[in-house]
Amino acid sequence: MSTDSTDRRLRLAAIVLAVVGLGVAAYLTYVHYEGLRPVCGLGGDCEKVQSSEWSKLAGVPVALLGLLAYASILVALLVRREEALIAAALIALVGFGFSAYLTYRELFTIDAICPWCVASATIMTLLALATTARLVRTPRAIEVRYPT
């Protein structure tokens, strides 16, 4: 498989993941602002997670932060510039770290699991992997930002 073909597949996978993540984050943001109970499924406690102190950062719902992150990643992926690839990878890596922290809080502080939140964390993890793989496979992207 050629490098170009692999890059196209990784880019397409990342775009699909960003769109799905955007949908999940949009739903959670909508639920937050409308004051609705999220559809959670068996064994989940979305309402407990959504109403916890960890559901906001500086007064901003983390679902809205996720929405902005997924939208930013999607735009960066659609731009097709090397600097945009660096931006997408950085946003996804920060999102991965923040999602890991929030998942830790779900498990060990809130003592509840929100399947929507876990889905978003999984999507962000896969986005971080896909965008970082593209970045590593494209050495020129690093050279553009940090010339030798």
PLM features: residue spans?
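Membrane-interfacial helix-loop segments of redox and metal-homeostasis proteins
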Residues: 1-148
